[in-house]
Amino acid sequence: GGKIEDYTGADKSSRAYPLIAVTTTAGTGSECTSDYVVVDEAQNRKYGNSDRNVLPVLAVDDYELMMNMPASLTAGTGMDALTHAVEAYCSIDGALITSELAAAAVRLIFEHLEPAVISPDRKSREGMAVAQFLAGLAFGNAGCGLIHSMSHQLSAVYDLPHGLCNAILMPEGSRANRKAPEAEERYAALCEAVFPIESRDMTTGERADYLIERIEKLSEAVGTKRKLSELGVKMEDLSLLADKTLLDASLRHNIYKPDKEEIETIFRSLM
């Protein structure tokens, strides 16, 4: 009972109900996490929350149910899954199991997302169904980070698709995170796990750069590389968006702690 606002935060419910989740998109990982969002339309704010009682007792990931997804939805949800995996891999709360799940998800997404968008078949749909599940397990274990914290504000203030916002923010958000030395090492390690042949003779910095470049190229290939201004984002709102980002729960998992000016700079660079 009560108002939906009563359930913002962590473990606010009093009891669990048996929940069976059947996914129809390949992106959110909601069938295997205890996370959910609440949108406060009055304040244009999106809250990330977690409650052990919302974790499904059974999850059904059947790629047959995803066969008719439109290309734009496939691209957006797929890039959301990629963001889950990359941010979980770099999370300060990650462990070995996080890294293994996230790396496997990233490999599958780079293999299957573009075909699933351009010429979907059973192989690409199944690959993305598995990838988003693994990514969900990864971020359910270690959380997300800066990119999700910024994305939440864009989708709340402007009612924009969450996955598209993640896709737009991921390259520049990742470059900002590289200011932390340990972050560069994490991006480099993920690059080596996903692109072992291509990155064989690269330095740590080159591997981190290469991974981010490949993310950007994938976003362009599936049609999610856009300017924020094209989507109605206003320059005069960037300060407010940065303030809201700093309050977002996902930011606590991030490997680098940006200040308001840095967050504004990222938004501005994408206008």
Tell where the protein language model's regions lie, with residue ranges.
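A glycine/threonine-rich phosphate-anchoring loop and its flanking beta-alpha core
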Residues: 1-94, 185-189, 193
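Glycine-rich phosphate/pyrophosphate-binding beta-alpha loops
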Residues: 27-28, 133-166, 248-252
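C-terminal and late-domain segments of enzyme folds
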Residues: 71-134, 138
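Short alpha-helical scaffolding segments that buttress acidic/His motifs in well-ordered protein cores
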Residues: 82-86, 128-136, 170, 215, ...
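Flexible, glycine/charged-enriched surface loops at secondary-structure junctions
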Residues: 93-101, 116-127, 142-147, 201-208, ...
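Gly/Pro-rich interdomain helix-loop hinge
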Residues: 157-237
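Short, amphipathic C-terminal "tail helix"
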Residues: 234-271
